[in-house]
């Protein structure tokens, strides 16, 4: 028993004293699955939010590509109720890493994405509760997004994300621009 206890203490001591070894991060062909969420247009209301899932892959120069899907819900006040606008979009983009710390724990990236999807206003019901008719229609939407994202490695396989994103989408009846503030988590899968 003393032999195993000594071996355990020796291994833990070596592991804690070797503070100079850093994990290999942002290597080519690494893949990750991202879960994202956040607020829309600076609103802290739980009624205006976005959520999504994405797959990211790293390239040779520590940049990455991203492919994903996102759901965005924004409510517009109308008298004593609110009118929801929901967007379902697919994304394909590329992010450039432009800043990182020496320990490779924090990475700051800027990226551009192409977006396409569908927008529905009031879930397709154009007649409101008071008899008014909505002029906004459901439509296919397309456009792009610019994203500033901070990645913070918690472990070698778990990454916390914080981002600010500006989306511009044409084809819909309502505003074209949406600002998003979000958080997420990425799981490195290989």
Model-based region annotation:
Residues 21-74, 186-190:
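Short glycine/proline- and aromatic-enriched beta-strand/turn motifs that initiate or cap beta-hairpins
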Residues 38-41, 76-83, 130-136, 168-172:
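Extracellular loop and loop/strand-boundary signature of outer-membrane beta-barrel proteins
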Residues 123-164, 187:
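Extended low-complexity acidic/polar segments
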């Amino acid at each position: 028993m003393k032999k195993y206890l000594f071996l355990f203490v020796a291994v833990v001591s070596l592991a804690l004293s070797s503070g100079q070894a850093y994990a290999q991060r942002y290597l080519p062909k690494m893949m990750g699955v991202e879960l994202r969420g956040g607020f829309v247009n600076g609103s802290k209301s739980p009624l205006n939010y976005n959520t999504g899932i994405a797959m990211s892959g790293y390239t040779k120069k520590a940049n990455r590509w991203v492919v994903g899907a996102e759901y965005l819900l924004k409510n517009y006040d109308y008298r004593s109720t609110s009118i929801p606008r929901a967007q379902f979009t697919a994304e394909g983009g590329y992010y450039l890493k432009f800043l990182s710390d020496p320990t490779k724990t924090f990475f700051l990236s800027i990226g551009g994405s192409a977006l396409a999807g569908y927008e529905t206003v009031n879930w397709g019901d154009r007649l409101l509760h008071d008899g008014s008719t909505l002029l906004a229609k459901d439509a296919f939407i397309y456009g792009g997004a610019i994203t500033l994202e901070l990645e913070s490695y918690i472990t070698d396989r778990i990454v916390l994300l914080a981002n600010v994103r500006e989306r511009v989408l044409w084809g819909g009846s309502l505003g074209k621009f949406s600002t998003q503030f979000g958080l997420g988590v990425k799981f490195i899968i290989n």
